[in-house]
């Protein structure tokens, strides 16, 4: 029984040692795939649409007496100068409705 346990441990260590170099080789590929995905997401953000409205913004904004026009975009995340006023769906993916 001890022999079986030792052989199993040696086999697992050998498999783990063989798997680590494969994982190291995959890291550059994963980094390239991540970069490509990030560029696609940036491209998708370039396809945002803008919505402008002056008085129909929301009741809380009207209560503040704001009369300036708002520009809103549907994005994955809002910029630091924008506020999230809910969600919107673009091509079946939910995003934030960000207004300036």
From Swiss-Prot:
Chief location of this protein? secreted
Against InterPro entries, the record matches this protein to: Alpha-defensin, Alpha-defensin_C, Alpha-defensin_N, Beta/alpha-defensin_C
Annotated propeptide span(s): 20-68
Result of changing residue 95 to A = Does not impact fibril formation or agglutination of bacteria
Keyword Transport present in the record's keywords: the answer is: no
Q: In which tissues is it expressed?
A: Expressed in Paneth cells of the small intestine (at protein level).
Fetch the SMART domains from UniProt: Defensin_propep, DEFSN
Q: Where in the cell is it found?
A: Secreted; Cytoplasmic vesicle, Secretory vesicle
Reported effect of changing residue 70 to A?
Answer: Abrogates self-assembly to fibrils and attenuates agglutination of bacteria and prevention of L.monocytogenes invasion. Fails to block intestinal cell adhesion and biofilm formation of C.albicans
Disulfide bond residue pairs: 72-99, 74-88, 78-98
GO terms for MF = protein homodimerization activity
Q: Could you give one GO CC term from the UniProt record?
A: extracellular region
The protein's UniProt keywords, in alphabetical order, are:
Antibiotic, Antimicrobial, Cytoplasmic vesicle, Defensin, Disulfide bond, Fungicide, Immunity, Innate immunity, Secreted, Signal
| Outcome reported for the amino acid change (mutating residue 97 to A) | Abrogates self-assembly to fibrils and attenuates agglutination of bacteria and prevention of L.monocytogenes invasion
A Gene Ontology biological process in which this protein takes part is: innate immune response in mucosa
Record-linked PROSITE patterns: DEFENSIN
The region annotated as signal peptide is 1-19
Q: How is it modified after translation?
A: Proteolytically cleaved by trypsin at Arg-68; the propeptide is stored in the tissue of the small intestine and the mature peptide is found in the luminal fluid; cleavage may occur during or after release into the lumen. The N-terminal propeptide region suppresses self-assembly and renders DEFA6 propeptide unable to agglutinate bacteria and protect human epithelial cells from bacterial invasion. Under reducing conditions, naturally present in the gut owing to the low redox potential or enzymatically generated by the thioredoxin system, the disulfide bridges are opened leading to a conformational change of DEF6, thereby changing its antimicrobial spectrum. The reduced form exhibits inhibitory activity against anaerobic bacteria, in contrast to the minimal antimicrobial activity of the disulfide-linked oxidized form. The formation of higher-order nanonets and bacterial entrapment is independent of the redox state.
Q: What role is this protein assigned?
A: Host-defense peptide that contributes to intestinal innate immunity and mediates homeostasis at mucosal surfaces by forming higher-order oligomers that capture bacteria and prevent microbial invasion of the epithelium. After binding to bacterial surface proteins, undergoes ordered self-assembly to form fibril-like nanonets that surround and entangle bacteria and thereby prevent bacterial invasion across the epithelial barrier.
Q: Which family does it belong to?
A: Belongs to the alpha-defensin family.
Q: Subunit info?
A: Homodimer. Self-assembles into higher-order oligomers termed nanonets, fibril-like structures that entrap microbes. Self-assembly into nanonets seems to protect against proteolytic digestion in duodenal fluid. Interacts with Y.enterocolitica invasin and S.typhimurium fliC/flagellin; the interaction creates an anchoring site for progressive DEFA6 self-assembly into nanonets.
State the protein's name: Defensin-6
Instruction: Please give the organism.
Output: Homo sapiens
Gene that produces this protein? DEFA6
């Amino acid at each position: 029984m001890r022999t079986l346990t030792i052989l199993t441990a040696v086999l697992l260590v050998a498999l783990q040692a063989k798997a680590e170099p494969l994982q190291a080789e995959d890291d550059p590929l994963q980094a390239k795939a991540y970069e490509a995905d990030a560029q696609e997401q940036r491209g998708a953000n370039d396809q945002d649409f803008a919505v402008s409205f002056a008085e129909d913004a929301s009741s809380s904004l009207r209560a503040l007496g704001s009369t300036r026009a708002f520009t809103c975009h549907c994005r994955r995340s809002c910029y630091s100068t924008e506020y999230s006023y809910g969600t919107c769906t673009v091509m079946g993916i939910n995003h934030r409705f960000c207004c300036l």
